[in-house]
Amino acid sequence: MYYMLIGFIIVVIAVIGAGYILKRKHYQRINELEEKKIKLRERPVIDELSKVKKLKLTGQTEALFESWRSSWDEIETRLFPDLEEVLLEAEMNTDRYKFRSATNAENDIEQMLVVIEKQMDQILGGLKELLISEEKNAKESRATKEKFAELRREVLTRGFKLGETLPYVEAKLNELSESLNSYDSLTDQGDHLEAREIVIVVQKEMQVIEAQMERIPSLLHETDTILPEEMNKLRAGYEEMVRKGYYLAQMELDKEISRMKNQIDKMKKNVINLDLDEAEQGVEELHNEIDLFYDTLEHEAEARHFVKENHSPTSDKLQRQNAVSDALAEQITEVKQTYHVAEDDLAVYLKTSAKLSEAKENFEQLTTLIASGEIAYSAAQDTLKEIDAALITISAEQDKFAEELRSLRKDELEARDDAERMRRAIITLDRKMERERLPGLPEEYLSLREHMGESIDTLEKRLEEKPLNMKAVSQDWRIAEEDLIHLTEKAEEMMENVRLVEHVIQYANRYRLRNKELADELVQAENHFYNDYQYKKALEIAVTALEKVETGAFKKVEKAYASKVSVDDIE
């Protein structure tokens, strides 16, 4: 019982202590909010309103002032009283230990203080701007009026440089003068904010006019003097070149100059209407056009030099290529008496011949036009370059065809010599096989030997045809060469097999009397070797039989054969 009482007392003390601590924290927060409220109340809103109220206000300025004063009245009559009530509520809830309710009230107070502070900032900021704008307007209006007076004086002293734009500039200045009068009127009436807007607009407009007055004289100088002079110089240069024999009708300069004059008139209207950006763009574009015409004239002068330098050499090239083409035609006629010339090959010559005729015709037409002065030198230059390029192609194609014709005789002689060489190669191969003293030749080899002879016969027969078809000769020639290679390979293989069979049987004889199976298989191998001449099969049977008796024996025999060691010396 005693311990229960002690525990209860401890709990009560803890609760009272916790309540005291929480209560203290809430009072601390309420005091902070109270201090913030007092600081807001001390802000000089009423003093600033009184200062502005002393000014003479009208229009937009008066409406703004009334809105600020109405906003302050709302703060004084509603927002601050509401704030006091919520502060009192927070204190009462704290005294009664209603800490949750106290916290809610404190949060509401913070939000209310934010609203009041924001509203007061707007009022004070607006009042300050109004007071500053009055002072700033006074300073800037003086500077603006002085600048305006300078512009007026400049127009009076330099107006002659503005040409036909002068009335438009003066009209702009008159509009600004009226705006400045409106500024004075609004200032006298107390509408300082609207007056300030007018000052800002006038300042910007004066900057625009000042910049325009700087640009107008140079643009008028371009449209009235520089561009017309450039066009006159261009026309003079054009006419001088025409007198010297240049054909320049393709430029249509009279039409183009008329068009450019219309462009100048349009640019001048743009300047008078103060559309200076478009005028400047037009001036730049027209200068570029004139430069292009000069480039064209310069190109014609360069082209004339090229034509005079290259006309005769091109004529010489044409004559030389004509001579080459005629000689090639004679060569074709001669070759066709001996050799068959394919239609495709003749088509190549006919095509190049047609190209040459076209180039010759184009050159003759060009020469006539140059003599009569009816072609621009630039066009003549292009035509000469095209003819020269065509002649280079024609020359290469005809040289290639001529070389192919010359190679026909060379290829014929080589084919005849090679046919003889292949016959000698067969005889040499036959003698080599005779020296080997083979038991006989198998049917397969005899068939290849016969086919080889027929291939050479076919080639030699083809070489006797008139006219000689070298494409067919080349085909028969290739077949004969392939057959000779195949026959030689077969002969070498057969002789190799014969030597190996003899070595294997000779080595196997050491086991022949002791091994009946080996002896029987060796007899079978010998039958193939001596009777039907199947040397490869005989080798396979003999090797298989020997390997059954002595594994690896064939490798030893092969090694001894390659090293030219006697079979009897193999261990």
Swiss-Prot record:
Record Pfam families: EzrA
Biological processes, Gene Ontology terms: division septum assembly; septin ring assembly
Coiled-coil ranges per UniProt: 102-147, 248-298, 326-374, 400-437, 478-529
Cystine pairings recorded for this chain: none
Primary role: Negative regulator of FtsZ ring formation; modulates the frequency and position of FtsZ ring formation. Inhibits FtsZ ring formation at polar sites. Interacts either with FtsZ or with one of its binding partners to promote depolymerization.
Keyword Cell inner membrane in record: no
Keyword Ribonucleoprotein (UniProt): no
Location in or out of the cell: Cell membrane
Topology feature Cytoplasmic, residues: 23-571
Protein name per Swiss-Prot or TrEMBL: Septation ring formation regulator EzrA
Residue spans, topological domain Extracellular: 1-3
Membrane topology: Single-pass membrane protein
Sorted UniProt keywords: Cell cycle, Cell division, Cell membrane, Coiled coil, Membrane, Septation, Transmembrane, Transmembrane helix
GO CC, one annotated term: plasma membrane
Family per record: Belongs to the EzrA family.
Annotated signal sequence range: none
Transmembrane domains' residue ranges: 4-22
